[in-house]
From Swiss-Prot:
SS bond list: none
Keyword DNA-binding: yes
Cellular component GO terms, alphabetical: cytosol
Keywords annotated in UniProt: Activator, DNA-binding, Repressor, Transcription, Transcription regulation
SUPFAM superfamilies, per database record: Homeodomain-like (SSF46689)
Taxonomic lineage from the root: Bacteria, Pseudomonadati, Pseudomonadota, Gammaproteobacteria, Enterobacterales
Residue ranges of domain HTH araC/xylS-type in the record: 145-242
Protein's UniProt name: HTH-type transcriptional regulator GadX
Source species of the chain: Shigella flexneri
Coiled coil: none
DNA-binding region: 162-183, 209-232
Gene encoding the protein: gadX
Quaternary structure note: Homodimer.
Length: 274
């Protein structure tokens, strides 16, 4: 398999297992070892049932679930390209994830299950101090992703350019400049994040319009409706009615989830123990 930059690989050794690095080095693992690695540094040419390739898009979804200190990108002279966690018992879901990963025509429910199971596997490494540096080194998130991560960690907060810049350990002027280089702004990203969350709360969770407005940081329901109508071309109530009738909307909830904007109401990410 060709090495892919921006992707990661999770391998599970049920028995003794060998991975070959792109530099020709061999890494040996014992049964029960779960491996997280930079896919661009690994050669995988057999035993596909032993690994799961995690795309950049999926990694970008996992990033906002981490605590905010994970966003502080410090320079690391040397970052390991591979981490190992020895599991004391078998991981029955790994085979399912591997099978789902080989299927190119997943149903919507299967897509969500695959993503959830991958997140569970990634969470095994959360207590490893080298995990976040490796994840960020592979992903190298742009400023848009980092700003959206801050916003989505507390969607209802009264965010300002200065506050977001403070969270990212930079000056407001520098943040504004970097966002301009990516042809966006903090206010545009704030609206995007809030509108995407609003859609999920309305269509998926069935929240009332007033509750959605408050949950997304709007003190005025009428202003929330105004922003929603400008963004989606219809009011929240009209969107609810069309969704209930199965009519197509400009941006369906399913497509927003599929494109990587699905966040639960609980923002914490607790690692599972194996």
């Amino acid at each position: 398999m060709q090495s892919l930059h921006g992707n990661c690989l999770i391998a599970y050794a049920r028995h003794k297992y060998i991975l070959t690095m792109v530099n020709g080095e061999y890494r040996y693992f014992n049964g029960g070892d779960l491996v997280f690695a930079d896919a661009s540094q690994i050669r995988v040419d057999k035993c596909v049932e032993n690994f799961v390739l995690v795309s950049r898009d999926t990694l970008s979804l996992f990033l906002p679930m981490l605590k905010e200190e994970a966003l502080n990108l410090h320079a690391h002279k040397k970052i390991s390209s591979l981490l190992v966690h020895h599991c004391s018992r078998d991981i029955p879901v790994f085979q399912e994830v591997a099978q789902l990963s080989q299927n190119k025509n997943l149903r919507y429910a299967e897509m969500l299950r695959k993503r959830a199971l991958i997140f569970a596997l990634l969470s095994v490494f959360l207590e490893d101090e080298h995990f976040i540096p490796l994840l960020l080194n592979v992903l190298q998130p742009n400023m848009r992703t980092r700003v959206c991560t801050v916003i989505n960690n507390n969607i209802a907060h009264e965010w300002t350019l200065a506050r977001i810049a403070s969270e990212l350990l930079m000056s407001p002027s520098l943040l504004k400049k970097k966002l301009r280089e990516e042809e966006t702004s903090y206010s545009q990203l704030l609206t995007e994040c809030r509108m995407q969350r609003a859609l999920q709360l309305i269509v998926i969770h069935g929240f009332s319009i007033k509750r959605v407005a408050v949950s997304c940081g709007y003190h005025s329901v009428s202003y929330f409706i105004y922003v929603f109508r400008n963004y989606y071309g219809m009011t929240p109530t009209e969107y609810q009615e069309r969704s209930a009738q199965g009519l197509p909307n400009r941006d369906s909830a399913a497509s927003i989830v599929a494109q990587g904007n699905f966040y639960g109401t609980n923002r914490s990410a607790e690692g599972i123990r194996l």
